[in-house]
Amino acid sequence: LSQSTHLMANDRETVETAIAGDIIGIYNHGQLHIGDTLTEGERLGFTGIPYFAPELFRAARSKDPFKAKQLHKGLKELGEEGAIQVFEDELGNLYLGAVGPLQFEIVAQRLATEYKVDAIYENTPVSTARWLTYPDEKTKKEFETEQTLRLAKDADGNPVYLATSIYNLQTTQKHWPEVGFHTTREH
C-alpha cells in the first residue's frame, strides 16, 4: 500500500504503517470498495455492506457523442464509489438508480467537473430494480432469453431485473418462482 495517506482534518501525511482506527487514504484503481477489510494474511469473514434497490431512476447520455467513453468511465467510477448505482443493459444504455434526488445532482456536478462530461438525464420507464439469483444455468438461460429487454448489470457485473412497475415485477415473480428477486445486494 505505497503512498498511503494519513488524513486528519485538513492535514495529509504519507504513512508507512497504520493501526486499527487510523483513517488513511489509499490510491485505488477499482480493486477496493467501501467496507473492504485489509489484513496481513488472516482470513476474516464479515457481513458485507448492503446495497439497497434504488427508488428513483434516470437514463443518462452524453450531450456530446464524442464524450460517451468519458461518461461511461465516470459513471462506472462513481458507481464503484457508491455515489450512485449504475445499471447497463445489453444495448449499452445506462440507467442511474438513487434513493434520493440529490444523488442525481451530485453525480451531474461531479461528471461535469471531474470528467468534463455534460450529460442529459431523462426519465425512464424503470420504477424498481431487483438483483437476481438463479437455481441453475438452465433457468438462468431461459429467464434471460424471455426477459432480455428488462435485464441489466450493475457496476460489479451482477444481473439485475429493471421492472417498469410493481405490477410488472409481481407478474414476473409469479411466472418465475424459482428465480430469486432481491431488494438488497451485499457488497
Set out the residue ranges of the language-model regions.
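C-terminal interaction appendages of subunits in large macromolecular complexes
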Residues: T124-H187
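Short, contiguous, well-ordered secondary-structure segments
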Residues: F66-F87, A98, I106-A112
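A common structural junction motif
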Residues: E42-F46, L78-A83, L111-I120
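Short glycine-/aliphatic-rich beta-strand segments at the starts of folded cytosolic domains
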Residues: P50-D64, E122, S127, W131
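Charge-rich, low-aromatic oligomerization/scaffolding segments with amphipathic character
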Residues: D36-T39, L102-K116, T171-K174, T184
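Conserved nucleotide-binding/hydrolysis modules and their immediate coupling elements
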Residues: L1-F57, K69-K73, E80, E90-N93, ...
